[in-house]
Amino acid sequence: MQENLKNDKLKIGKYEFDSRFILGSGKYSLELIKSAIEEAKTQIITLALRRANTGEIANILDYIPKNITLLPNTSGARNADEALRIARLSRELGCGELIKIEVISDSRYLLPDNYETIKACELLAKEGFTPLPYMHADLYAARAMRDAGAAAIMPLAAPIGSNKGLCAKEFIQILLNEIDLPIIVDAGIGSPSQACEAMQMGVSAVMVNTAIAEAKDVALMAKAFSLAVNAGRAAFLAGLASVSKAKASSPLTGFLRD
């Protein structure tokens, strides 16, 4: 089993990673970014392009170690065309071809627009990007995103920033059953135990932002999530026992009347 864990890689398109914990960077002070990355033991960090403005004195890229893979997102895009423009700008800034597609036209609930996200997947894939669409867990939309060129599917667990956990658990399970791409749970994970539960389901990775950024001790919470993700993955690989009725843990033969 130790060998299984050692060789267990997260594969996204042509990329491979040892860590299955993706760290968001949207709510941290710049001073806390580096310590959170170190304690999270992550290899991927998401990045809103507005925080990577190379014309500013305080640039988040200066606080992210060079060995970390950047996953820029299209935050702020309201449709597929806007997502494409942001992705192009990201590539011009040297952020690479991995891109998390975020298309949100609803400012109240901040739910992803699956229809525009499908269109964005197709547009970005045609331009050589490796798209990872953030989406509402829906099988038909996930199939369309896969067919449009998505390298992974990133369903929300609960509304972004809500910390409510796996509200969409049953729908995520359907994606796990039917979609032959990495399923990365994104948004709504509020505690290490929820991240562990998601990994136990068999998702490929978990992304967390708010629950760490708003913790009293950011670095320690990042470490807690990292341990939880690893524990959940190990439990999934080990094979969780599942029974439908009571089963004694000790033999009952020769006991009392027998």
UniProtKB/Swiss-Prot annotation:
1-deoxy-D-xylulose 5-phosphate binds at residues 161, 187-188, 209-210. GO terms for molecular function: thiazole synthase activity. Homotetramer. Forms heterodimers with either ThiH or ThiS. It is found in: Cytoplasm. The gene is thiG. Pathway: Cofactor biosynthesis; thiamine diphosphate biosynthesis. It comes from Campylobacter jejuni subsp. jejuni serotype O:6 (strain 81116 / NCTC 11828). Keywords: Cytoplasm, Schiff base, Thiamine biosynthesis, Transferase. Pfam families: ThiG. Catalyzes the rearrangement of 1-deoxy-D-xylulose 5-phosphate (DXP) to produce the thiazole phosphate moiety of thiamine. Sulfur is provided by the thiocarboxylate moiety of the carrier protein ThiS. In vitro, sulfur can be provided by H(2)S. This is Thiazole synthase.
